[in-house]
Amino acid sequence: SEPYVMGSHATCSGAWVSGPEDISPPEYYWGYNRMMTVQGLFGAGDTVGGSAHKFSSGSFTEGRLAAKAAVKYIEEQKAKNIKVSDEQCEKFKKIIYKPLENYTVGRNEITGGTVSPSYISPIQGLQRLQKIMDEYVGGISVNYMTNGNLLKKGLELLDWLQEDLENVGAEDYHQLMRAWELKHRALTSQCVTEHTLFREETRWPGYYYRGDHLKLDDENWHCLTVSRRDPKTGKFTMEKMPVYHIIGDEEKKKAS
């Protein structure tokens, strides 16, 4: 069982990326192999969805494919109009280093132990995230079982955690790294919970079970599910995407 996201390495979950030009249907291809829906951003390994159990061999192979496509993207001058101003850099520096400021301002408010009224530490947020995902999103403590009501409650608690993570504090650069790891993990967990709620079936028995939809439902859910998150509101929109079996039965027979 993995922390934060149960069965994460085997659920095919991850970013939606373009497939290779030679075999991808139109819905799976938009210009460059392994490029995400954000132009110029490429992914590989566990970052990318659509394939389970990549392990190190699959991940570094996919990394090589993504790197070659990124180089091609640059060589074809697709990135020539990308401009980054000093003002943008300063803005992001303030965002990145904010946990250090939160700690510096709030540390003198602690009267005992490690609990501050104005910030939470990365370890405190991490423990909350683990508890939410374990108890509400089908972790080992509940025998990998969840349901619609539990998932909705989990999303409510994850929303509260996201609010508190605006005030995460870091006493040094190592804790700053931990703070940003926590922010990214919390967002990933939120996304997985939204998808688990949206998919009303049990697609991967053994990794999680929807107690209110225990059976596999190919009639309604033989598909991919994709989401978009509004960066301003934090709200997700969900939709289904078709699954194309690019390698058909005849090819499988030949391969075996």
Kindly label every feature range from the protein language model.
Residues 10, 22-256:
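Glycine- and aromatic-enriched mobile tails/lids
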Residues 5-9:
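Short loop/turn motifs at secondary-structure junctions and domain boundaries
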Residues 1:
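Core active-site phosphate/anionic-ligand binding loop and the adjoining beta-turn-alpha structural block
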